[in-house]
Amino acid sequence: TAGGKNVSPGPIEEVIKRCEFVSQALVLGDKRPFISALVTLDEESLRPWLESKGLNRDIPMEEAANNAAVRAEVQKWVDQANEGVSRAESVRKFIILPEEFTQENGLMTASMKVIRPKVIKRYATLLNTQMYTKKK
């Protein structure tokens, strides 16, 4: 973080990815005031989950990413991840993205590893305007 705290993102990301419809979680904090996460949804797993909650399983992914029930379920897993770390290491904010990180969109390697610098670059505007906005 900007405060000099080194945080290992792997364990936090793994807990968040235990949510049945989360495909990827990318924990961010380097040179940032607090820890945050970008979360992607697995459409195949999400659709039956939505239906099981009495929600429309056919909503567009953009709408699903902003759905209150989806957000609440992801928040449960973020909270669980935060239980195992100090306050300085905990995820304070997260954004659910409407698209996954893939090789096709250039955000994953052939060995299915997320390319952090490319993700950060692609979502820089979102991070700067929604995640790390300065309060006036």
Regions picked out by a protein language model, each given a short descriptive name:
Residues 1-87, 100-104:
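AMP-binding/adenylate-forming catalytic core of the ANL superfamily
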Residues 24-26, 77-136:
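Conserved C-terminal "lid"/linker of ANL adenylate-forming enzymes
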